[in-house]
């Protein structure tokens, strides 16, 4: 890519005729750097969200915390579970899986709230290193824990890793062509699918949850390798024609912004400029908060209660299947930006709220006759959530100037985390209320 792919210099010979030097090598360099960055951001998205997803997939096991002799923990119950609360019409854990959600999201919320204020002062490399170490620590701590409390501490490490990583890598996209946002989003969707599917598959194959978690320690190493070895230097970026086409169609989010501003550090923005940019972002932040509130209220508040007795799947297995199908929908829609772009993300928020109302009604009245209908609804739920995420960040990338884009990406990160945190806080009392019903 380097500095030679941006423009073709013309030279004049002695007769005044212009000749063009052979562009093939610079073009190949540009294409090679493009694909290295594309793959790099996809892997960063995959590895960054992997531990977060696995902890949510393991939430039922973490809270059940059944043990046998030896060091294997969280043993999968048989296909006919014994209710933890025999007086309730639901098969409830004593603590809602929303507790795992809160441990998995509140540290991320704190990081994202503080990030726009001063995280940019810390270089990217130390942030990535801390993120990788915390991810590895989360797998080890949960795998070897002997209490729910210790396991939740491990979940907190996963939250720190994913939260710090998301703010870091989304801010980093400001120094690369806008196309990397699509690759990052696809990678985060892939983390959901591969994380949930690997946990489901390995436990179904007979591995204990402890062995399954320890087998995933290669993911943090892959994250570090992707950042330090695969990405090209951002100073050498030259977006070329694709960026020019996007800028021509761009509708400025802040009307006074300069259309030709260059990428730069958000540390140069004053507090007044940051507030002005943030107000312009609310059109996208609010619907994303609503989408994530609705879907995680479903995932961590209702999944555990959407239990069907007339199947061969145990309660824990049903929960894992719900998580896997949700993540499959997220992956598909987060990878669809090239063929489907949605500007009005409010529509996605409305549809996700309708999902929440419908499934909450089913938990209360129990009118769905088959678990396979729930499978389809959960897949659809994931499609809506993934589409909201990728289109929100893509729209912001198009509608903010390069000068504001790094700050805008970091500030918008708060949306999903805020929605998830609110859903967890409300899902806890809902769980206690429903589980007391006889």
UniProtKB/Swiss-Prot annotation:
Transmembrane helix is among the record's keywords: yes
GO terms of molecular function: calcium-dependent protein binding; glycolipid binding; glycolipid transfer activity; sulfatide binding
Phosphoserine carried by residues: 12, 14
Presence of keyword Phosphoprotein: yes
PANTHER family (UniProt xref): BATTENIN (PTHR10981:SF0)
Post-translational modification: Highly glycosylated.
Subcellular location(s) of the protein: Lysosome membrane; Late endosome; Lysosome; Golgi apparatus
Residue spans, topological domain Cytoplasmic: 1-37, 149-151, 204-277, 368-438
Residue positions the entry lists as glycosylated: 71, 85, 310
Transmembrane spans: 38-58, 128-148, 152-172, 183-203, 278-298, 347-367
Organism of origin: Homo sapiens
Lipid bilayer topology: Multi-pass membrane protein
Keyword list, A-Z: Cell membrane, Cytoplasmic vesicle, Disease variant, Endosome, Glycoprotein, Golgi apparatus, Lipoprotein, Lysosome, Membrane, Methylation, Neurodegeneration, Neuronal ceroid lipofuscinosis, Phosphoprotein, Prenylation, Synapse, Synaptosome, Transmembrane, Transmembrane helix, Transport
Domain notes: The C-terminal (153-438) mediates KCNIP3 interaction and the cytoprotective activity. the dileucine motif mediates AP1G1 and AP3D1 interaction.
Residues covalently joined to lipid (S-farnesyl cysteine): 435
Result when mutating residue 254 to A: Loss of lysosomal targeting. Does not affect interaction with CLN5. Does not affect interaction with CLN5. Loss of lysosomal targeting
Name recorded for this polypeptide: Battenin
Propeptide: 436-438
Variant or mutagenesis effect after changing residue 253 to A: Loss of lysosomal targeting. Does not affect interaction with CLN5. Does not affect interaction with CLN5. Loss of lysosomal targeting
Residues with the Cysteine methyl ester modification: 435
Pfam families per the UniProt record, alphabetical: CLN3 (PF02487)
Source domain of life: Eukaryota
Region of interest (Disordered), residue spans: 1-25, 237-268
């Amino acid at each position: 890519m380097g500095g030679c792919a941006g423009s073709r210099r013309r030279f004049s010979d002695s007769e005044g005729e212009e000749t063009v030097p052979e562009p093939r090598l610079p073009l190949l360099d540009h294409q090679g750097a493009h694909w290295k960055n594309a793959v790099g951001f996809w892997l960063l998205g995959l590895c960054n969200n992997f531990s977060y997803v696995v902890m949510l997939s393991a939430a039922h096991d973490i809270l059940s915390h059944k043990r046998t002799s030896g060091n294997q923990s969280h043993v999968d119950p048989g296909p006919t579970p014994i209710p933890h609360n025999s007086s309730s019409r639901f098969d409830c854990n004593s603590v809602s899986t929303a507790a795992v959600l809160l441990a998995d999201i509140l540290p991320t919320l704190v990081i994202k709230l503080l990030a726009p204020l001063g995280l940019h002062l810390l270089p990217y490399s130390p942030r990535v290193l801390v993120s990788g170490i915390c991810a590895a620590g989360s797998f080890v701590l949960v795998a070897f824990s002997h209490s729910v409390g210790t396991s939740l501490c491990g979940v907190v490490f996963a939250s720190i890793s994913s939260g710090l990583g998301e703010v870091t890598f989304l801010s980093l996209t400001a120094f690369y062509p806008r196309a990397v946002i699509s690759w990052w989003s696809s990678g985060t969707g892939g983390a959901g699918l591969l994380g949930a599917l690997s946990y489901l598959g390995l436990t179904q194959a007979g591995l204990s949850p402890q062995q399954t978690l320890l087998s995933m320690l290669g993911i943090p190493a892959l994250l570090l390798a992707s950042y330090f070895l695969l990405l090209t230097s951002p100073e050498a970026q030259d977006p070329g024609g694709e960026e020019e086409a996007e800028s021509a169609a761009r509708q400025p989010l802040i009307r006074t912004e300069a259309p030709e501003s260059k990428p730069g550090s958000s540390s140069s923005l004053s507090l007044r400029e940051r507030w002005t940019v943030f107000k312009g972002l609310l059109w996208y932040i609010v619907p994303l908060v609503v989408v994530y509130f609705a879907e995680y209220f479903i995932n961590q508040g209702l999944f555990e209660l959407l239990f069907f007795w007339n199947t061969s799947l145990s309660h824990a297995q049903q929960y894992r299947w719900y998580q896997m199908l949700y993540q499959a929908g997220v992956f598909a829609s987060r990878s669809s930006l090239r063929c489907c772009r949605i500007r009005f993300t409010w529509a996605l928020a409305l549809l996700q709220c309708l999902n929440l109302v419908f499934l909450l009604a089913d938990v209360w009245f129990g009118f769905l006759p088959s678990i396979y209908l729930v499978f389809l609804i959960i897949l659809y739920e994931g499609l809506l959530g993934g589409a909201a995420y990728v289109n929100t960040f893509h729209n912001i990338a198009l509608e903010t100037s390069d000068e504001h884009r790094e700050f805008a990406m970091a500030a918008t990160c708060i949306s999903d985390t805020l929605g998830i945190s609110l859903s967890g806080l409300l899902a806890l009392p809902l769980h206690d209320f429903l589980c007391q019903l006889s």
